[in-house]
């Protein structure tokens, strides 16, 4: 316990060290309970070590505590002065400690003594001060002082964490960049990829062209080589096994082919064990059956089509609808197109591969196997042999796989609706009967296989459904048919045949795709059935225009051309053209047939949102994987302005594929490079034009013309100088013998002496009559102007020089060459053409008034009927009345416009010819009042037709020779003229009787 002196000492303020910091509130080392217990433990351990060194074998005391090892339970030992409360009280009351003295370094451990563990006894093996876990005091002192000096080490750790975070982010960006492999669809066909860092653009294009030709030529050779190797390997193995078995019939041979697969052992069964037994066996199989069974297992495991493998391709709803429509239409057309599908040619069977190898003797053929489909029950009156032969011929002709005909045997591998691998053996003995049906192979379930429409129709008919007539020629009916018509098939059946379950689409989505995208199907009202409209071609989409023709197999092309006469004709013309080109020696390299365009990935460089934009050509962008590009934050579009974005353009790689005449360039090209330039492997550039001409800037006028002069507005001397053309000596193809009056009218006369200037008389009626508003007949005049210009002697010198130049042919050739090009460059601008503007001086001007122009003849209206004609139909009268009313309204508006345009027209009398005003009064005006109502209507119509004429009548109906402006206005406003009483009767109507007294 602490005494009173300690208490008085604890009341004083704690002392400070040399740096001004208060000393730690700790007790002195001599009063520390922890150090006391440590000393006891150290002394006990030293006694044990010394006794063991002297050979004393007495009982060894167990240490009460360990200085280093403590249990995590938190319990303390039963010691005298190990009370924590008293320890803290003593430490708080005696905070003075000597830090400068190295011998008085106090312990920082609290007084919680834990129990010993079994591992703590290991410390007793080391002598005092030699435990590697605890360095000497000097080392501890230095480390403690360093910790005090650097009290805040969290800043150092924070800086390290920041550096690691930045490095981790950079590594993630590089990993995303290297994951851009291009297309998932063509990942298996990838051949190699390169990256270009410091290569010039021209050399880079040469390298790309060379590698394209290499990759295109490698496709055919690699396929043939791989097939030859496989055939050679299997053939050698089979024949080596055959030799060993023939030589050693009674014993096993080490060179015989062992059974190295569980599938092979299961397939062969007991015969496989018997084949490798030491003694002769009656159940030993033949060589052909053994090799065939092993080849079946190998081909089954190896010939899994890519269509059955999972493909994680990101497609939009629009693309998925197109794919659904293509799959459904393929059942009826046998053809499929589009960028999402790719034809996988069927691998020929192993027997055909063995036969094709010339150096290896073919083993005996296995017995014929059954067909893919089950036998359909024959109806009465059908010949089985005829059906079998026709079925075999159909299968052989429509097969989508490779066909090999050897010795009268046709082997078709991987054809349409599940007839892949069918073998029709014409030389088989008649006694051999093939089984009814063979097992299903993986290639038979390939969704990308070639469909045979005839077999699909037979299958639908076999199910009891009435299918439509398929081959209806090229005519296609787009009109809807009646619901009770033939040809309706359940939509669920077609979905199963097309294997649409592999696309993960719902029936409602399929109905929506058919109704929106297809023009060949008709859905029923309930949506359960579907009908094919007919024809041999499917729906054509806009994305099918850029489809690569290389995706179609030769057999598919034959099928398509065979079903269409136009296609067959086109194919024959193409073959003839190719043969002529080959005969003339004008064959082109494979790289010339494909126009290579680099592919640019348009993505925004935002870390939160990325978008994929469609660009480049249709044939190249089909191979961009949207799933890979959507995760990229690199901008390849070239629209950036910072240096960092320019550098990102060249981070991608150039990927080449097996047998493809294109490459995927994810690095892009600079924006100033023209995409129309094509570079071949020989380094020749198809784009014409030298470097100097390419560097020029094409100068055009405001109208878009690249000519330096305007032939219709500039003078002939300047035009002749700019075009190097002499008007006095035209070419032979131009004849100027004829006389053109247009040239005399529009070419102004030239005269060098102003005193001898003569004004030529104008022709009659130089300007025709115009119907513009505000133009009067008196506005007819002419102005004669005499101008003076300065004749430049330089133009004459240039003209004489151009006529005597010897390079006229070269200049014409250059002009023709510039015209043929799509974007002609302007001819070189001469220094002499940059002239000052011409100054025109007006010497004299005369104003001549011409005679007023004659007005056009007045418009006349002749009614389409006479008094002799009688109408019985009232509807005709109504239609005539409507026409007359419309014409009256038009005449009223014309009259108002004429008065506004010619205000003094009403003041002067207008004299007209009397012949125009004369008319038959007996037939037109005078009528008997005893006529009926219908004749009154006719007379009213006739009266209004007469009023439209510029004519006035008096009381007895005689015509007048003079019509005043007021009368004309009255007539134009459709007011009736004076009757027998001489007064106006208001507006005329069709019900009035016009009579004279």
Swiss-Prot record:
The encoding gene is: FRQ
Show the ranges annotated as biased composition (Gly residues).
410-421
Q: Where is the composition biased (Polar residues)?
A: 74-94, 138-152, 264-275, 391-402, 675-688, 986-997
Q: Which UniProt keywords apply?
A: Biological rhythms, Nucleus, Transcription, Transcription regulation
Q: Which GO terms describe its biological process?
A: circadian rhythm; regulation of DNA-templated transcription
- UniProt-recorded name of the protein: Frequency clock protein
The annotated regions of Basic residues compositional bias extend over 227-237
Compartments annotated for it: namely: Nucleus
Q: Give a yes or no for keyword Transcription in this entry.
A: yes
Q: In this entry, which stretches build a coiled coil?
A: none
Primary location group: nucleus
UniProt lineage: Eukaryota, Fungi, Dikarya, Ascomycota, Pezizomycotina
Q: What does this protein do?
A: Circadian clock component involved in the generation of biological rhythms, in particular in rhythm stability, period length, and temperature compensation. Behaves as a negative element in circadian transcriptional loop.
Basic and acidic residues composition-biased segments:
115-125, 438-447
**Similarity comment text for this entry:** Belongs to the FRQ family.
Q: Where are stretches of biased composition, namely Low complexity?
A: 239-261, 277-294
Key word Transcription present in the record?
yes
Species this chain originates from? Sordaria fimicola
One GO cellular component, as annotated: nucleus
In chain numbering, where does the motif Nuclear localization signal fall? 569-573
């Amino acid at each position: 316990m602490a005494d009173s002196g300690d208490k008085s000492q604890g009341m004083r303020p704690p002392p400070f060290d040399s740096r001004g910091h208060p000393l730690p509130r700790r007790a002195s080392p001599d009063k520390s309970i922890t150090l006391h217990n440590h000393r006891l433990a150290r002394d006990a351990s030293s006694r044990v070590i010394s006794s063991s060194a002297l050979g004393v074998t007495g009982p060894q005391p167990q240490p009460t505590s360990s200085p280093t090892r403590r249990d995590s339970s938190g319990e303390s030992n039963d010691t005298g002065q190990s009370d924590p409360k008293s320890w803290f009280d003593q430490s708080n009351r005696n905070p003075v400690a000597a830090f400068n003295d190295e011998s008085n370094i106090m312990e920082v451990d609290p007084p919680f003594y834990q129990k010993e563990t079994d591992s703590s006894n290991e410390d007793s093996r080391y002598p005092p001060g030699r435990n590697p876990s605890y360095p000497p005091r000097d080392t501890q002192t230095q480390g403690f002082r360093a910790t005090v000096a650097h009290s805040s080490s969290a800043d150092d750790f924070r800086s390290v964490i920041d550096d690691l975070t930045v490095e981790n982010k950079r590594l993630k960006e590089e990993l995303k960049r290297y994951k851009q492999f291009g297309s998932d669809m063509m990942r298996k066909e990838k051949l190699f990829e390169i990256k270009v860092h410091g290569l010039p653009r021209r050399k880079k294009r040469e390298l790309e062209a060379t590698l394209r030709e290499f990759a295109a030529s490698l496709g055919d050779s690699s396929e043939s080589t791989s097939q030859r190797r496989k055939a050679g390997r299997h053939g050698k193995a089979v024949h080596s096994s055959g030799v060993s078995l023939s030589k050693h019939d009674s014993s096993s041979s080490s060179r015989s082919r062992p059974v190295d697969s569980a599938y092979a052992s299961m397939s062969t069964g007991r015969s496989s064990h018997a084949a490798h037994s030491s003694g002769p066996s009656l159940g030993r199989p033949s060589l052909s059956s053994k090799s065939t069974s092993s080849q079946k297992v190998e081909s089954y495991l190896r010939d899994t089509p890519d269509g059955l493998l999972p493909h994680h391709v990101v497609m939009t709803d629009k693309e998925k609808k197109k794919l659904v429509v293509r799959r459904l239409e393929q059942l009826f057309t046998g053809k499929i197109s589009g960028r999402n599908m790719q034809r996988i040619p069927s691998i020929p069977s192993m027997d055909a591969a063995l036969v094709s190898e010339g150096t290896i003797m073919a083993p005996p053929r296995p017995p014929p196997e059954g067909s893919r489909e089950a036998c359909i029950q024959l109806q009465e009156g059908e010949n089985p042999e005829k059906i079998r032969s026709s079925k075999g011929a159909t299968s052989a002709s429509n097969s989508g796989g490779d066909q090999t005909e050897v010795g009268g045997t046709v082997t078709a591998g991987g054809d349409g609706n599940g007839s892949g691998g069918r073998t029709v053996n014409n030389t088989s003995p008649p006694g051999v009967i093939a089984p009814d049906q063979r097992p299903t192979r993986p290639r038979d379930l390939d969704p990308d296989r070639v469909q045979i429409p005839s077999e699909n129709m037979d299958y639908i008919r076999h199910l009891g459904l009435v299918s439509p007539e398929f081959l209806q020629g090229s005519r296609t009916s787009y009109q809807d048919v009646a619901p009770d018509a033939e040809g309706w098939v359940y939509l669920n059946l077609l979905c199963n045949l097309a294997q649409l379950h592999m696309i993960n689409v719902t029936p409602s989505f399929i109905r929506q795709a058919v109704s929106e995208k297809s023009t060949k199907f008709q859905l029923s009202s309930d949506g359960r059935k579907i009908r094919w409209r007919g024809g041999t071609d499917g729906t054509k989409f806009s994305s099918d225009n850029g489809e690569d023709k290389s995706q179609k197999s030769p057999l598919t092309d034959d099928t398509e051309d065979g079903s269409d006469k136009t296609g067959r004709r086109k194919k024959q013309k193409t073959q003839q053209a190719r043969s002529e080109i080959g005969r003339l020696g004008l064959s082109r390299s494979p790289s010339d047939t494909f126009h290579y365009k680099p592919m640019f990935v348009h993505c925004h460089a935002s870390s939160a949102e990325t978008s994929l934009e469609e660009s480049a050509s249709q044939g190249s962008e089909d191979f961009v994987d949207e799933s890979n590009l959507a995760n990229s934050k690199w901008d390849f579009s070239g629209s950036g302005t910072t240096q960092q974005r320019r550098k990102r353009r060249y981070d991608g790689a150039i990927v080449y594929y097996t047998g493809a005449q294109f490459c995927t360039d994810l690095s892009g090209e600079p924006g100033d490079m023209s995409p129309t330039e094509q570079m071949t492997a020989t380094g020749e550039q198809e784009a014409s034009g030298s470097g100097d001409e390419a560097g020029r800037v094409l100068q055009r006028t405001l109208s878009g013309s690249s000519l330096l002069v305007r032939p219709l507005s500039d003078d002939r001397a300047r035009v002749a100088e700019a075009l190097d053309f002499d008007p006095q000596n035209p070419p032979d193809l131009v004849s100027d013998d004829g006389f053109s009056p247009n040239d005399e009218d529009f070419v102004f006369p030239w005269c060098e002496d102003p005193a001898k200037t003569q004004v030529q008389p104008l022709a009659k009626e130089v300007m025709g009559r115009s119907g513009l508003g505000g133009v009067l007949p008196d506005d007819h005049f002419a102005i004669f102007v005499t101008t003076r210009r300065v004749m430049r002697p330089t133009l004459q010198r240039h003209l004489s020089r151009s006529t005597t130049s010897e390079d006229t042919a070269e200049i014409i050739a250059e002009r023709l060459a510039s015209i043929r090009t799509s974007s002609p460059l302007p001819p070189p601008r001469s220094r002499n053409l940059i002239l000052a503007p011409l100054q025109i001086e007006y010497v004299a001007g005369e104003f001549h008034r011409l005679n007023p122009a004659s007005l056009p003849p007045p418009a006349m209206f002749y009614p389409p009927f006479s008094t002799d004609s009688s109408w019985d139909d009232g509807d005709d009268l109504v239609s005539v009345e409507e026409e007359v009313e419309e014409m009256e309204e038009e005449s009223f508006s014309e009259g108002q416009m004429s008065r506004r345009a010619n205000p003094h027209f009403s003041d002067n009398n207008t004299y007209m010819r009397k012949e125009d005003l004369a008319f038959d009064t007996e037939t037109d005006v005078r009528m008997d009042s005893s006529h009926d109502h219908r004749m009154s209507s006719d007379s009213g119509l006739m009266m209004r037709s007469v009023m439209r004429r510029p004519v006035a009548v008096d009381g007895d109906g005689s015509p007048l020779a003079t019509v005043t402006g007021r009368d004309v206005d009255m007539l134009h406003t459709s007011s009736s003229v004076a009757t027998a009483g001489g007064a106006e009767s208001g507006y005329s109507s069709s019900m009035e009787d016009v009579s004279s007294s």
